[in-house]
Amino acid sequence: MISNFNLSYSLKHVSSCFIFSDNNDPINKLINSLNSNLNLKVRLPSDYNLLADEFLPPNQSVLIDFKDIDDNWFSKAKHLPSLFSNRRSPYFPTLAQKHILESLKTVPVYTIVNDLNEIVIASPRDLTNFNSFNWVKRFYNDWFIWEKDEGNVNIGLFFMNREDAELYLHQICLKDPRGVENVGVNVKTISLDTFYKLNRLSPPRLQFKLIADLQEIKNILNVNSNSRVSFHPKQKYDKNWFKGIPIFIYSPTVTNLDWTLKSNKNMIFFQEMMHIMFQKIY
């Protein structure tokens, strides 16, 4: 069982070293744009996974302008601040979400942390000097105007595959060895419920993304692999992309009476190989 401990996130440490040279990777393209000192525009999928960016025509994408919050200091407040509910997910966790959190405690995911056990965040460079006036303006925007993220956002990445997280760490070390030496960074294993909480409860302009096991996506999109699995009717995918994190479900049937008598619940796997092995056993 994965131990569940408290993690914090920091916008200070190793926030300017996320600049990669591989422009063919859509994730790297996004991070490059976030770290640019130019007012760039980035095309993101509207209702598809970020990894599908390379395969979508322009009319299926949304053009996002990376700019600071509205300079209109006299914007009318849209709501009153609440000290008793979260701004991103006011009703989290519901009863159903509590059950999900409990189930996710045994699922490992990986992220990059510093020596203070703070999650390393990729932050955009501010286009203007962040003085006390800008701080007050942003505070007002966050508490009285903010309804969803627009413009610059900070991103914390989690990975289903440890090797992908280690590759990400390696790129960080290559681009900013001095910063890494000062704060220390390493791959941390945590439980998936921690990511779920951060994803739902993060403050304005801070988002946590879960990166799928890229090898698993490659496997399920392979022609030979497709013969072993069937896709859910609502799953969005094509021959070159797959939305979200692949989850494999084994449903007990009457052909295996012993198993059916023991449990009528579906078994869920995050790796196709484990799913196949389970099918062979039962």
UniProtKB/Swiss-Prot annotation:
Could you tell me which Pfam families the record lists for this protein? Tic22
PANTHER family for the chain: PROTEIN TIC 22, CHLOROPLASTIC
Q: Which UniProt keywords apply?
A: Chloroplast, Plastid
Name the InterPro entries for this protein: Tic22-like
A cellular component term, taken from the record's GO annotations: chloroplast
Organism of derivation: Guillardia theta (Cryptophyte)
Q: What family is this protein classified in?
A: Belongs to the ycf80 family.
Sorted alphabetically, the Gene Ontology BP terms of this entry are:
protein transport
Q: Where in the cell is it found?
A: Plastid, Chloroplast
The protein's name in its UniProt record: Uncharacterized protein ycf80
- Indicate yes or no for the key word Plastid: yes
